[in-house]
């Protein structure tokens, strides 16, 4: 089961060389326009990067598995004296904003920096995600989120008038398969959603042992014993819960897979 991973840490490590390159290019193109307040240097000479740090990352949700993310970079650099009569330098730091995008379905191999500008401390998103790539939901916006969820899977009738959403119909609309199995011997696990095909262990009542079975991706397993011992409402709620889990945590799972390709499920609080 996957633990929550940090997108900021991943970006900081994987794209470090990209950020150094864009920082160097930014200084090259903008050094004359920066308000640097030089104290030792009489004339700007060679610019030497000393450090480039990812200070903060803001992620914006896009359709499918795509994301857009803004990265605040701090750039430490030396400005060497350009007048050969002097031999001195000034140490300076600036912040810039780097706007990036990529597709998690491609493991961000299509990563692109499409804009670089001065950092102004402001960043607003209509579809923010947290550092684990889980959509940020606000209490005063839950109705709108529910409506958007129903629209994504073409349950338009529920938007016209209140109606019950059949769990099996929702799962089918989402391309998910529901199976009743014995997840454990004691029924302690009610349901589980598999994002990726994998081999897992299920309880076999005949042999009274755990047996291995390959579970396809996009499968929801519901524990047969737990379902039998509870009411239909809890069963339906479990299926709906796993469907929502699939929808809202696909990108969090994709991030976890960037750290560990063996993962097939994602644990959430």
Model-derived segments and their meaning:
Residues 1-269:
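Short juxta-domain linker segments that transition from a proline/glycine-rich
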């Amino acid at each position: 089961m996957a633990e929550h991973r940090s997108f900021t840490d991943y970006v900081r490590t994987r794209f470090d060389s990209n950020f150094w390159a864009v920082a160097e290019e930014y200084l090259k193109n903008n050094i004359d326009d920066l308000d640097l307040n030089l104290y030792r240097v009489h004339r700007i000479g060679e610019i030497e990067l000393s450090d480039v740090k990812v200070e903060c990352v803001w992620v914006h949700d896009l359709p499918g598995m795509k994301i857009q993310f803004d990265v605040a970079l701090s750039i430490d650099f030396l400005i060497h004296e350009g007048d050969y009569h002097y031999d001195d330098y000034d140490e300076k730091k600036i912040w810039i904003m780097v706007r990036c995008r990529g597709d998690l379905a491609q493991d961000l191999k299509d990563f692109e920096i499409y804009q670089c500008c001065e950092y102004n401390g402001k960043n607003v998103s209509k579809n923010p995600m947290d550092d684990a790539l889980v959509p940020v939901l606000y209490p005063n916006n839950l109705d709108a989120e529910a409506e958007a969820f129903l629209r994504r899977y073409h349950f338009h009738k529920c938007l016209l008038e209140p109606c019950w959403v059949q769990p099996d119909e929702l799962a089918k609309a989402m391309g998910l398969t529901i199976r009743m199995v014995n997840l454990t011997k004691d029924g302690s696990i009610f349901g589980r959603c598999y994002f990726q095909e994998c081999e897992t262990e299920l309880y076999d009542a005949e042999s009274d042992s755990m047996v291995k079975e390959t579970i396809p991706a996009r499968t929801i397993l519901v524990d047969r014993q737990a379902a039998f011992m509870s009411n239909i409402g809890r069963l339906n709620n479990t299926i709906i819960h796993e469907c929502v889990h699939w929808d809202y945590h696909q990108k969090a799972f994709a991030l976890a897979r960037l750290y560990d390709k063996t993962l097939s499920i994602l644990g959430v609080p």
